[in-house]
From Swiss-Prot:
It is found in: Secreted. The modification Arginine amide is found at residue 62. This is Cecropin-A1. PANTHER family: CECROPIN-A1-RELATED (PTHR38329:SF1). Belongs to the cecropin family. It comes from Drosophila sechellia.
Length: 63
């Protein structure tokens, strides 16, 4: 039972310490992931535009 109290106390101190620290490296990783998502979104939108134009050309060619 005494070990449990010590464990809870150490976990609480650790959580407080980590919570107040700067998330510099985590923020950098998050920014990189966000950039990848933005590039993927932009490429998808651009690809859909090209596909729509190709479909219009194909429909026009068929008559």
């Amino acid at each position: 039972m005494n070990f449990y109290n010590i464990f809870v106390f150490v976990a609480l101190i650790l959580a407080i310490t980590i919570g107040q620290s700067e998330a510099g490296w985590l923020k950098k990783i998050g920014k990189k992931i966000e950039r990848v998502g933005q590039h993927t979104r932009d490429a998808t939108i651009q690809g859909l535009g090209v596909a729509q134009q190709a479909a219009n050309v194909a429909a026009t060619a068929r008559g």
